[in-house]
Amino acid sequence: MNKDLQIAKKTVQTEIQALTKLSKSFGRSSYFSTAVNLLSKIKGKCLVVGVGKSYLVGLKVSATLSSLGTPSVAFSANDLQHGGLGAIQKNHDILLVFSVSGESLELNSILKYANEHKISVIGVSCKSSSMLLRYSTIKILLPKVIEAGHSLAPTSSSLIFLSWGDSLAIACMRKQKWDNKKFILTHPSGTLATALIQVKEIM
């Protein structure tokens, strides 16, 4: 096996180990269920917030939430600090904030704003003593994982955040009894909706 393939295999193995740690962590806390219950009763929308790679993960998580029945939009922390906070409906919306370290300075003013206006915050971090979790209503502590590629860029951590977000969206979908009929309404185009419509017509 050449060196490139060895690197590829090592990367995948490292990320599999990270996902295994995430899977095992679900049994150690009830906060995931608390987050599901809160989002399932949401009156407004879920604003998913992050900085850098965490924001990019948040874009996907937000899209999945909306796709499966939980209204959601994603914001970079920078945009929220420059007028985006006006998008938050007090007493209706919930913030879902992703940050590996939980110490990103861009989050500071956002978390203070949320606390001052009694806006619920679901904080997701890998650091138990982080600023993010201190300010969060629901504190989600994910396991510390080894980043693939000498820890030079978020890799394994981005993957477990994404997997956690998918788990949240699917659990909320089940809780809200989101079915094929509702899925078709929000997916008028694409192969998934077309396949479901064809099955429905046959039945």
What are these regions (language model features)?
Residues 10, 14, 159, 163, ...:
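Generic recognition of short, well-ordered alpha-helical interface segments
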Residues 30, 130, 190-191:
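Serine-centered coil/turn micro-motif
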Residues 1-41:
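An N-terminal, well-structured beta->alpha segment
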Residues 9-18, 65, 197-203:
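Short, basic/glycine-rich phosphate-binding loops at helix/coil junctions
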Residues 40-176:
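Glycine-rich phosphate-binding loops that contact phosphosugars or nucleotide phosphates
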Residues 134, 148, 174-203:
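Internal, active-site/partner-interface "lid" segment
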